[in-house]
Amino acid sequence: MKMVGMITGAKRYILSPPRECSKLGIVTERQNPIFRHSLLNFGHLVHLDDPTKVEEMPEEERLWLERAGTATALDTVVKAGEVLYIPSHWFHYITSLQKSAQCNVRSGVDFEGDIHFGGGEDVTSGCVI
């Protein structure tokens, strides 16, 4: 698990559980330098509501964004003085909204996860080659 304490400023976090990894455009090859990261810019999901932007978008990006748009996700803004808990194996996309400083703490790994959201096994069986 990970705790993020925002000291100053604000950041937007989009969190998605392990069971959704197949919808998130995750790089699955262990030798790849961006292994377990997504190739998608989740900030572009809003472009799917604009027909002009959709026409300009490469088809592969549009298809992946449409798929990512169906994933279960939590969208929140963490502001100065707030703490965000990120469960083990959850994927997170972060956008700075202001100049900010944060403190992160990791504490162990929960391999079993949650009956509703999944855990480490969902990541290794569903996303990792």
At which residue positions do the language-model features occur?
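Active-site region of the double-stranded beta-helix
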Residues: 1-82, 93-129
